[in-house]
């Protein structure tokens, strides 16, 4: 499971997820990608489940890139504990995902295989996603320039 080796601080504020993703929203490594359409926290377990689903479907062919990393600790208090006495201990790690963020990229497989693999991974995600290709990305960039 993914988690940082060390962090500067053990606990973080929850924060807010406003707006769209300004970074990590373009295909950089592969030919096909899975893009988030809603804001959410994606846990390390969900990222790993998606990775396993894609690699199992694509078999030996293809290379997979995970474009998100769980770097935010989520704390929880023990069950049936009274209020007060500080913040709970870190339980798991999440990645803050905003709309437009690329979650996974894949190349070295056909579009049909990539689409099917990403669809299986999309079922593991807690949000709506879309399958995109480098060709589709270039078209959307050209539309913005006009």
Swiss-Prot record:
Per the record's keyword annotation, is Glycosyltransferase included, yes or no? no
Give an example GO cellular component term for this record.
chloroplast
Q: Report the domain of life of the source organism.
A: Eukaryota
Q: Where in the cell is it found?
A: Plastid, Chloroplast
For the keyword Plastid, the answer is yes
**InterPro entries membership:** Ribosomal_uL16, Ribosomal_uL16_bact-type, Ribosomal_uL16_CS, Ribosomal_uL16_dom, Ribosomal_uL16_sf
Entry keyword set: Chloroplast, Plastid, Ribonucleoprotein, Ribosomal protein
The biological processes this protein is annotated with in GO are: mitochondrial translation
Question: What would be one Pfam family of this protein?
Answer: Ribosomal_L16
Single GO term (MF): structural constituent of ribosome
* CDD domains in the record: Ribosomal_L16_L10e
Q: Which SUPFAM superfamilies match?
A: Ribosomal protein L16p/L10e
Q: By its UniProt entry, which HAMAP family does this protein fall under?
A: Ribosomal_uL16
Quaternary structure per UniProt?
Part of the 50S ribosomal subunit.
* Classification via PANTHER family: 50S/60S RIBOSOMAL PROTEIN L16 (PTHR12220), LARGE RIBOSOMAL SUBUNIT PROTEIN UL16M (PTHR12220:SF13)
Q: Which family does it belong to?
A: Belongs to the universal ribosomal protein uL16 family.
- Listed name of the protein: Large ribosomal subunit protein uL16c
Organism placement in taxonomy: Eukaryota, Viridiplantae, Streptophyta, Embryophyta, Tracheophyta
Name of the gene encoding the protein in the UniProt record: rpl16
